[in-house]
Amino acid sequence: ESEFYIQVVKQGQTVACHDYSLRELLHDFGDLESCETYEYYNHNVNHGQGGQRRVTAKGWSLLTLLELLPEIPQREELENGSVKFQIFTNDNYKEKIVLEANELSAYRFLLAYEQDQRSQDGLEKGDTSSWADEDLHFAPIKGTTPFRVYCGKESANPSVYKNAAGMVVTILF
């Protein structure tokens, strides 16, 4: 059963669609798992006043997952503007955003399945640790999918895609 897909499009045609469950990703790519920390402004924290949120997420670099696929060109082609991508969510949020593949490495896009979440102004819904806590307390991602995609765009949205369901990669040549 697919919980996250990567669809590859070339010259307007789908040339491949790779479907993954969380179990498959853990089994097949567990050795490629990484941990990233992201800090970003969230307008919902601090009783709607806004504030800083820090997330340390476990998962897989989207760039690394792409580089494993036979349809994906070499990294230099990924980074020269010849490839674009979109991240899709189950709630259709942010789907119109099309990015260039070089942003995958520049902003550390991570397909996360567990996270330690904390808010600077006190515990908020979903937080697993206090801001000052030295230890990380990971919890599974909860939502309509077991994934979120985080990226290191601290000063520009989006920093997080909730309920991540898949991505479409378009090869322009």
PLM-predicted stretches and their roles:
Residues 1-173:
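N-terminal intrinsically disordered, low-complexity segments enriched in P/E/S/T
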